[in-house]
């Protein structure tokens, strides 16, 4: 169907390059950089760099690195970038639950500075006072934002922060001699799936609460679930459907009365910054995704940071080291009585920490609150407009307003036309909108999750809405066009079955060759 006059939709087609993997571009003898020999005064001082390495650990053959000239490397990655979509290219609001906001480029420049890039975690503390100050002051900022008493910046993702919460919870009960009997973790179906998954990795039996007719976690079900076996509660609020539970303090009270610990998954905190805090809801632990909420980029599996906060009582269990300040200098503090130890090497993903620190400083307290308000405003504007599109609904209509996102349903459209949510999102890719299907678990039928954040203008939201309207009209008039989409992307369809088959996984070049041989490596998209 042609784009209608007056529509904000753009004619879009991705570039397609029959581009090899970088290893396939290798030509013996080519080089991108000539590494000079170390000067004599340096080699005399530090040696040859190899003699201290045990012979059993030394290579017997040269590493199989690609030999490619600089110009060809530049072309390679520019071509790949043209085959991609990202937050700097499109209205990236369809990636619900992921808070794809604008990442200020000045913060990228700060993090790329040699002052940040050239320091090493093994340096003496006296030589990295600036970095330690950034980490210490970010801890202070997050204390104010959450109301909790101390933060560890060590976890390197939201899921790792949840696993760290589970480890702290286990150690807390271990100290009290109850770890063996308190083996149940309560969560909700619309909390982030990692809340259940990470706790299960730690060995907990998971009890999942379902919502009532208003979309709220059922408080009566919680009362029935708690027992002497309750280790704790991990819950996201607002949940992944965008509904804020106003009875959250009642939930924590019920779990505390049963002897459990309450952990707050604040992956969806973008709509409540400066408005409500973990402290007032009486949580013991919480974490923020710095790579989402606080302006550092989110995507491609990292880098990330799940800053983990604790009350004064549970701060005794945080990973070591935390950063301290004695009035004259910053230092790495290992004096944490019941620490669970380390959850990663060194002290955290420092570039992410630095970007988040700069983002908070640039906005200030009122700016954080304004960002949250605009995110909520954008979301509720979309809520009204999307639900006016025939075939789109918003489940749990008892909650008239949502916070930072909404999980919509295309069930009515599917029943009428046979076009499902995957078809809609694939067709949206033909107009330059990032395809994403993060709507798990599929409790809402034909789910579709949108999170606009504070970054997008009304005009950009209207452009996205025009895309949805166009695709829905096509679903009724040209369903095969939608079914066969995308038409303008680099890859038409990806066989997603391999994602669930470990035998097919090959996340490195070496693994690809080992599993499938060079014939498979030559296959082009």
Protein language model features and the residues they cover:
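Non-catalytic terminal extensions of PLP-dependent enzymes
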Residues: 1-149, 167, 174-177, 276, ...
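FAD-binding core of FAD-dependent oxidoreductases
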Residues: 91-100, 159-162, 193, 299-304, ...
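Glycine- and other small-residue-rich loops at beta-strand/loop junctions that grip anionic moieties
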Residues: 96, 154, 188, 236-244, ...
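Conserved PLP-enzyme active-site core in the AAT-like
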Residues: 130-133, 160-331, 338, 418-419, ...
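A short, small-residue-rich loop immediately preceding and capping a beta-strand
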Residues: 149-155, 184-187
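General small-molecule cofactor/ligand-binding pocket signal
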Residues: 152, 207-209, 436
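Short strand-loop junctions, especially beta-strand C-caps/beta-turns
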Residues: 156, 212, 236-238, 409-413, ...
């Amino acid at each position: 169907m042609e784009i209608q006059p007056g529509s904000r939709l753009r004619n879009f087609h991705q570039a397609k390059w029959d581009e090899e993997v970088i290893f396939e571009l290798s030509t013996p003898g080519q080089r991108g950089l000539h590494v000079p020999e170390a000067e004599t005064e340096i080699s005399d001082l530090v040696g040859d760099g190899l003699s201290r390495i045990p012979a059993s650990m030394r290579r017997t053959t040269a590493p199989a690195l690609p030999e490619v000239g600089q110009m060809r490397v530049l072309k390679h990655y520019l071509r790949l970038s043209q085959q991609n979509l990202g937050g700097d290219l499109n209205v990236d609001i369809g990636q619900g639950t992921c808070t794809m906001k604008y990442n200020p480029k000045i913060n990228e420049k700060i993090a790329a500075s040699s002052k940040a890039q050239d320091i090493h975690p093994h340096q003496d503390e006296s030589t990295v006072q600036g970095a330690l100050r950034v980490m210490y002051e970010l801890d202070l900022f997050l204390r104010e934002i959450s109301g909790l008493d101390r933060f560890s910046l060590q976890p390197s993702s939201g899921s790792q922060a949840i696993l760290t919460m589970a480890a702290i919870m286990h150690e807390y009960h271990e100290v009290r001699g109850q770890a063996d009997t308190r083996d149940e973790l309560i969560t909700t179906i619309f909390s982030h799936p990692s809340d259940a998954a990470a706790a299960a990795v730690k060995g907990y039996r998971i009890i999942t609460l379902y919502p009532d007719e208003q979309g709220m976690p059922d408080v009566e079900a919680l009362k029935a679930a708690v027992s002497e076996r309750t280790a704790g509660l991990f819950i996201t609020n607002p949940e992944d459907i965008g509904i804020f539970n106003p009875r959250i303090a009642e939930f924590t009270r019920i779990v505390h009365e049963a002897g459990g610990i309450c952990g707050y998954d604040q992956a969806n905190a973008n709509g409540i910054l400066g408005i409500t805090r973990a402290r007032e809801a009486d949580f013991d632990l919480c974490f923020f995704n710095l790579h989402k909420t606080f302006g550092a980029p989110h995507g491609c599996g990292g880098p990330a940071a799940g800053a983990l906060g604790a009350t004064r009582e549970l701060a005794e269990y945080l990973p070591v080291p935390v950063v301290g300040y004695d009035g004259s200098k910053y230092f790495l503090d290992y004096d944490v009585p019941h620490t669970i130890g380390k959850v990663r090497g060194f002290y955290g993903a420092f570039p992410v920490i630095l970007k988040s620190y700069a983002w908070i400083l640039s906005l200030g307290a009122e700016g954080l609150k304004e960002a949250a308000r605009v995110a909520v405003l954008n979301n509720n504007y979309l809520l009204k407009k999307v639900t006016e599109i025939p075939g789109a609904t918003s489940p749990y209509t008892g909650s008239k307003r949502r916070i930072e996102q909404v999980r919509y349903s295309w069930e009515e459209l599917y029943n009428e036309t046979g076009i499902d949510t995957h078809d809609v999102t694939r067709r949206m890719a033909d107009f330059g909108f990032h395809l994403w299907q993060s709507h798990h678990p599929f409790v809402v039928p034909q789910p579709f999750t949108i999170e606009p954040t504070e970054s997008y203008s009304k005009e950009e939201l209207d452009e996205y809405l025009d895309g949805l309207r166009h695709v829905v009209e096509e679903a009724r008039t040209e369903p095969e066009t939608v079914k066969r989409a995308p038409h303008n992307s680099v890859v038409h369809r990806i066989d997603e079955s391999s994602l669930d088959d470990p035998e097919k996984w090959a996340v490195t070049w070496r693994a690809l060759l080992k599993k499938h041989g060079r014939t498979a490596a030559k296959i082009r998209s």
